[in-house]
Amino acid sequence: MQSPAVLRTSRQVQNAHTGLDLSVPQHQEVRGKMMSGHVEYQILVVTRLAVFKSAKHRPEDVVQFLVSKKYSEIEEFYQKLYSCYPAASLPPLPRKVLFVGESDIRERRAMFDEILRCVSKDAQLAGSPELLEFLGTRAPGATGLATRDPSVLDDTASQPGDSDEAFDFFEQQDEVQPPTLGLSSKDVEKSLVGEEEEEEEEEEVLDPLGIMRSKKPKKRPEVAVRPKPAPRLTIFDEEVDPDAGLFSSDKKVSETRRPLETTQDSLKLFDDPDLGGAVSLGDPLLLPAASESRGPTSRPEHGDASKELFRVEEDLDLILNLGSEPKPKPQTKPKPLVPAKPALPRKPTLPASVGPSEPGSGPQKQQQIQAMDEMDILQYIRDHDTLAQDSPSLF
C-alpha cells in the first residue's frame, strides 16, 4: 500500500482542541474486470499534528492528504471504535442493500462524512491508535496521543522543541541487524574487521616485480558431502516378495530347497519311479530308502483303499441323498364332483299346417287385429320377448 502524499496547505484547522479535521467530500468508482468493481470513499485529512508530518515539514505547518477507503473498511473501523470506546456517541452506519445504486452511494458518503466529523471532534477518538491505523500511520508513539491533555494538542504548533520529535511516519526505517548471540559488541566488531581484511588480502595480491596488481580468486570453503541416507520405503515402493521363488525355474527351486531335502519325512505323496529292467529288488546298487519305501506300496490293500478313495458317484442326486430315507408323499384329497350343467330348453316348434288353409281364416285374423287394443299389443310383445330369451345364444 503506497503512503498518501502529504502536502502543505493554507487551510485552518476547525477543531483546534484536537488539531484534526476529517471529511468525505467525494467518492470514486473503481471498475474491475468484466462486471466487477467497487466504490471508494475519499477521506480528506487536514491536521497540524506531528504524527502526520514528515521531516521536511515545520511544526507550525498545516498539512492535508487523501485516504481512499471501501465500505467494508469503514465498517470495520466503526465496529472497532464501538468495541473499544462504548461510551462514544457516533451516528449509525448506513444500511446494507443488495443492489447499490447512485442514491445509495450518495447517502453513504453523507453518513460517512458525518461519522468522521464526529470522530475528529472527540479528543479521545481523534488520538486513538485505531484512527491512526485507519488513516495509514503506524508509529510506536501514536498510542500515547489518546492519553494526552487537549491543551497539549493545541500548543503543538507554538512549541519549538517539538521539531526534534517530528519524524516521517510514511518512510520506512532502516533495519537494524540483530546482535550475535553469545558475543559482546567488541567481539562482533573485531570479527567483522578480521573478515574484511582477509577478503582484501585474497582479492589483491602484488606480483613479484611490484608493478601490476592482480585479483586472486577466492577459495570457497569445501563442504563435506554427506552420504545420502537410504531411501525409506513408502506405500508405493515394491517390497521383496518372499514367495517369488515358487514360480521360478527348476534350478532356482532346487537351490532354494536343498536344505529342506536333508530332513527326511516318513510320508511321501508319490511313490518312487519303477526302474524296471534287470535291477532286482535286493540289488545293493539301489538306495536302502528306496527298497524300504517300495514295500508298503506293493501291497494290494493300499490299492483297494485308493480305489475306494477315488471312487466318486457321478450322479449328484445320489450323493445328496446318501444316508437320508425318502419321505412318504402325502395323499392328495379327492376333488369334489362338479354338478352337470342343466339341459337347455328347446324352442317351441310351430305346428305345420297340413292341407289347404281354410277360406275364412284370413278375414277372421284381420278382424282380430283390428279389435286388439294397446294392452293386447303389449302382451303380444312380451310373449315374443320371453321366447327370444329362452332360446340359447352362441355369443
UniProtKB/Swiss-Prot annotation:
GO cellular component terms, semicolon-separated: endoplasmic reticulum; mitochondrion
Pfam families for this protein: PX (PF00787)
Region ranges (Disordered): 143-310, 322-374
GO biological process: cell surface receptor signaling pathway; regulation of apoptotic process; T cell differentiation
GO molecular function, one term: phosphatidylinositol binding
Limits of the PX domain: 19-142
Tissue: Ubiquitously expressed.
PANTHER family named among the record's database cross-references: HCLS1-BINDING PROTEIN 3
Function, in words: May be a modulator of IL-2 signaling.
The name this protein goes by in its record: HCLS1-binding protein 3
Species whose genome carries this gene: Mus musculus
